[in-house]
């Protein structure tokens, strides 16, 4: 039996959605009437508008990534994919393209993270979170992405991981599988390969960039088709708010805390704290637009939940500001902060779950 507690949030939502479909018909009719009434009290159009703004941004950002990959592939092809020759003849051009790739990813990342709370928390959209940001590779069957990468040269990368991981680690050179083989990525010509110097496998990078753009467009289309319900919004809050411990663990294991000893290959373009703040910022927007509905269950509790969620967002933003100002957090501090954030997040999710029960609105989470 699948252990749902070990799955990414998006997979958990999708599994719960399937189980919910088997529920009692009379209960479903009652919940449907509650949903209809609830829709009048929540500004669901504002939530969808926020989502569409971000899916459109991601489409544009992935097009920029793909265009850069096309340019890099063309340069590598002209050198017959001889990467030593490529560096010898076009070192500055390669360096510029790699730096552009890193900048393009850094731009695309918040376009997704700011909407992740909605995408990962809504059953009809949750698979795209697995594809873009949460899914693992083939070594993790329960959470692996549902796609393979087919390259122009005819190679197949079976379930290689989510696209944020693929693009970031290729652009920054932190995943050797996606790098050119046999040539040191010495982009500045100083005789050493340092962190941030990358020589992507052009064949793989182009295929990954093209597919990233394809799935970004699919997400945009699915978001346009989505008809939001109050249950969707409350589910997103309940599922995505109490994910702090895993995010803080990724931060602890990243270069921002562990330095060269980092076990995380991703989260190098920006601190995981940035992602946490972006995700929580999106969830604050979702809650703001359903608070009038939650207040019908308990107005005082609704205000307390609002305050608690804003404080949790403020905690993440404050930690990020300290880190950006030069403070070096320790692994022990990351553990403590993660536990504190998770405790707060679980309390918030519990309050929203209670409100949904009083309103007879189903939360589609296991």
Language model feature labels by segment:
Residues 32-366:
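Mature extracytoplasmic or organellar-lumen-exposed domains after removal of signal/transit peptides
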Residues 1-20:
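Sec-dependent bacterial lipoprotein signal peptides
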Residues 20-21, 311:
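A general secondary-structure boundary signal
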């Amino acid at each position: 039996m699948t252990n749902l507690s070990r799955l990414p949030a998006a997979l958990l939502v999708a599994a719960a959605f399937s189980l919910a479909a088997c529920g009692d018909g009379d209960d479903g009719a009652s919940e449907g009437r509650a949903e209809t009434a609830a829709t009048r009290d929540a500004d669901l159009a504002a939530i969808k508008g926020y989502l569409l703004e971000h899916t459109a941004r991601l489409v544009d950002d992935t097009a920029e990534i793909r265009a850069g990959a096309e340019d890099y592939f063309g340069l590598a092809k002209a050198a017959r994919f001889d990467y030593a020759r490529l560096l010898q003849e076009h070192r500055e051009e390669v360096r510029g393209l790699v730096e552009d790739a890193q900048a393009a990813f850094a731009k695309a990342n918040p376009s997704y993270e700011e909407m992740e709370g909605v995408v990962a928390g809504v059953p009809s959209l949750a698979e795209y979170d697995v594809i873009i940001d949460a899914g693992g590779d083939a070594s993790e069957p329960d959470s692996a992405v549902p796609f393979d990468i087919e390259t122009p040269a005819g190679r197949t990368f079976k379930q290689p991981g989510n696209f944020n991981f693929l693009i970031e680690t290729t652009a920054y050179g932190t995943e050797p599988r996606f790098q050119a083989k046999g040539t040191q990525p010495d982009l500045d010509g100083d005789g050493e390969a340092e962190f941030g110097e990358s020589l992507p496998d052009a064949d793989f990078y182009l295929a990954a960039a093209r597919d990233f753009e394809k799935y970004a467009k699919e997400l945009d289309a699915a978001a346009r088709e989505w008809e939001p319900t109050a249950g969707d919004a409350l589910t997103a809050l309940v599922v995505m708010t109490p994910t702090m411990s895993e995010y803080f663990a990724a931060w602890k294991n990243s270069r921002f805390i562990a330095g060269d000893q980092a076990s995380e290959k991703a989260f190098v373009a920006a601190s995981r704290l940035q992602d946490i703040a972006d995700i929580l910022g999106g969830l604050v927007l979702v809650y703001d637009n359903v608070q009038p509905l939650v207040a019908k269950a308990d107005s005082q509790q609704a205000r307390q939940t609002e305050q608690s969620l804003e404080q949790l967002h403020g905690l993440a933003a404050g930690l990020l500001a300290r880190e950006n100002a030069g403070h070096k957090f320790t692994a022990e501090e990351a553990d403590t902060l993660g536990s504190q954030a998770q405790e707060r997040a679980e309390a918030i999710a519990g309050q929203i779950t209670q409100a949904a029960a009083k309103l007879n609105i189903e939360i589609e989470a296991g």
